[in-house]
Swiss-Prot record:
Keyword Metal-binding: no
Residue numbers binding ATP: 60-64, 207, 219
One of the record's GO molecular function terms: ATP binding
Family according to the record: Belongs to the CDC6/cdc18 family.
Lineage, broadest ranks: Archaea, Methanobacteriati, Methanobacteriota, Stenosarchaea group, Halobacteria
Top-rank taxon, per record: Archaea
Function summary: Involved in regulation of DNA replication.
Keywords: ATP-binding, DNA replication, Nucleotide-binding, Plasmid
HAMAP family: ORC1_type_DNA_replic_protein (MF_01407)
GO biological process per UniProt: DNA replication
InterPro entries: AAA_22 (IPR049945), Cdc6_C (IPR015163), Cdc6_lid (IPR055237), ORC1/CDC6 (IPR050311), Orc1/Cdc6_arc (IPR014277), P-loop_NTPase (IPR027417), WH-like_DNA-bd_sf (IPR036388), WH_DNA-bd_sf (IPR036390)
Pfam families given in the database record: AAA_22 (PF13401), Cdc6_C (PF09079), Cdc6_lid (PF22703)
Protein name (record): ORC1-type DNA replication protein 11
Length: 414
C-alpha cells in the first residue's frame, strides 16, 4: 500500500467548492445580473460599450458575475460577423499606479518576444504604446480592472474611457469595467473620472442566508457524494456566512474545510458539529493572517476596537475610537497617526472582515459618518495581538479575556 491513496468516500468533485469554479448558472444574484447584462447589451448592438463600475464587499459575486456574463457575451458576440470583441481581465492587486496598469495592458496585447519593462519609460511613451496596441487590435475592447481600488492615482481611469474622444484611438471602441471592494473608492475619484468611469453603477449587496443556501446547495450537489451531508449542514454554513458579512467565499471555504475534516477523521458523513469545528479553525487562521499583515498602528486600532466592544461602546464613530487609539499609541511609545490615516486603517480592517462599517446620514445637521463594530471573536483577536498587548498593557475591559497575572502566551495555550 502506498503512502498516498485516493479518498473517495466524501468528495465527488472537491474543486466545485473552490472560488474559481464556474457553475453553469449563477444563483442568488438575479437582480444584479439582469442590470449587468443590460449594461453590456450595447456590445451586441454594435454600439460604443458602456463603462461599468461594480462595488460591494468581497465574496458577493462581483468577479464571478463578471466572468459568467463575459463568457456569455463572448460566445454570443461570435455569432455576429460585424462584432469583433476582445476582453482583457487584469487584477490590480499589487499594481498601485496608472503607469503599472498601462505597462501591463501593453504586454497583454503583445506576444512574449515584444514585452516591455515595467520601469524606465516616460508615461507619455507608455500611453502611446497602449493606444497603438488597442488600435491594432481594433473592434470592441472591454478592459476589466478587478480590485481597481488598489490604484492610487486615477490617471488611467480617465485616459482609457476618454481615449477615443481625445483622438488617441480611431479603430478601437473601449469599455472599462471597474470592480471594487471598497465603497469609499468611488467617492475618492476626481469628478472627471467619475463622469467617465461610472456611466453604469451596480452595487452587489451582501448575500442573505437564503441566497447562501442556494449557492451552497448548488455546489454541494456537485462536490459531495449523495448522503454525505447530514440535515442542517448547508443551513448552518449559510447562517455563519450571513453573519460573516454575507460572504459566499467564506461560506464555501467553511463547507470545504468541514469536508476536509470529515475526510481526515475518516467519517462517512458531515455533521453540524464538524461545521462548528471547521469554523473555529478557519476563524483563528483568518484572524491570525489578517492581523499579521497589519502595521503597528493597525494593531493599535484593532486593540482599541476590542476594548470598546467589551465596554459595550460599539458601534463606535471615529471620534469615539480615536481617544482610545491615541492613548494606546502613547503607551506603546509611538506618535499617533492623524485622523485621516487612522480612518484608513479602519477601512482596511473593514475590508479584512475584522470589523464592519455602516454609513449613517443624519442630513444637514448631523452629516454623514460611519460607525464601526467588531465582527470577529475578541478572544481570538487578542490571541493574535500578543506583542501589542504586551506593549500597551492589558486594558481593564479585557481582563475577563486575559488573566492579568498570566502572559498572553499562556492565554493562547489554554
Amino acid at each position: 500500500m502506498g503512502m498516498f491513496e485516493r479518498d473517495t468516500e466524501i468528495y465527488l468533485d472537491r474543486d466545485a467548492l473552490r472560488e474559481d469554479y464556474q457553475p453553469e448558472n449563477l444563483v442568488g444574484r438575479d437582480t444584479e445580473l439582469n442590470r449587468y447584462r443590460a449594461a453590456l447589451q450595447p456590445v451586441i448592438n454594435g454600439e460604443q460599450p458602456n463603462n461599468i463600475f461594480l462595488y460591494g464587499k468581497t465574496g458577493v459575486g462581483k468577479t464571478a458575475g463578471t466572468r459568467y456574463l463575459i463568457d456569455h457575451l463572448e460566445e454570443d458576440a461570435a455569432k455576429y460577423e460585424d462584432i469583433d470583441l476582445t476582453v482583457k481581465m487584469l487584477n490590480c492587486d499589487g499594481l498601485s499606479s496608472s503607469y503599472q496598469i498601462a505597462t501591463r495592458l501593453v504586454n497583454e496585447f503583445r506576444d512574449e518576444t515584444s514585452q516591455i519593462s515595467t520601469t524606465g519609460y516616460p508615461r507619455a511613451t507608455v500611453y502611446d504604446m497602449l493606444w497603438t496596441e488597442l488600435d491594432s487590435c481594433g473592434g470592441t475592447i472591454y478592459i476589466v480592472l478587478d480590485e481597481v481600488d488598489h490604484i492610487e492615482d486615477d490617471s488611467i481611469l480617465y485616459q482609457l474611457p476618454r481615449a477615443r474622444a481625445n483622438d488617441n484611438l480611431s479603430s478601437a471602441k473601449i469599455g472599462i469595467i471597474g470592480i471594487s471592494n471598497d465603497f469609499s473608492f468611488r467617492d475618492d475619484l476626481s469628478p472627471k473620472v467619475k463622469s467617465s468611469l461610472c456611466e453604469e453603477e451596480i452595487q452587489f449587496p451582501a448575500y442573505d442566508a437564503k441566497e447562501l443556501i442556494q449557492i451552497l446547495q448548488q455546489r454541494a450537489d456537485v462536490a459531495f457524494h449523495d448522503g454525505v451531508l447530514e440535515d442542517g449542514v448547508i443551513e448552518l454554513c449559510a447562517a455563519y456566512g450571513a453573519k460573516d458579512a454575507g460572504d459566499a467565499r467564506q461560506s464555501l471555504d467553511l463547507l470545504m474545510k468541514t469536508g476536509d475534516l470529515a475526510r481526515d477523521k475518516d467519517t462517512d458523513t458531515i455533521s453540524e458539529d464538524l461545521v462548528r469545528e471547521a469554523r473555529d479553525v478557519l476563524e483563528r487562521g483568518r484572524i491570525q493572517e489578517g492581523i499579521s499583515g497589519l502595521t503597528q498602528h493597525g494593531h493599535l486600532v484593532v486593540y482599541a476596537m476590542v476594548t470598546l466592544d467589551q465596554e459595550g461602546k460599539t458601534p463606535a464613530r471615529t471620534r469615539d475610537i480615536r481617544p482610545r487609539y491615541t492613548n494606546f499609541a502613547e503607551k506603546a511609545g509611538i506618535d499617533p497617526l492623524v485622523p485621516r490615516r487612522m480612518r484608513d486603517h479602519l477601512g482596511e480592517l473593514s475590508m479584512l472582515g475584522i470589523i464592519s462599517a455602516i454609513e449613517r446620514n443624519e442630513g444637514r445637521r448631523g452629516g454623514t459618518y460611519r460607525e464601526y463594530s467588531l465582527e470577529m471573536d475578541p478572544e481570538m483577536i487578542l490571541a493574535a495581538l500578543e506583542k501589542t498587548v504586551d506593549d500597551v498593557g492589558i486594558h481593564k475591559s479585557v481582563t475577563n479575556l486575559v488573566d492579568a497575572e498570566a502572559t498572553l502566551s499562556d492565554f493562547q495555550s489554554t
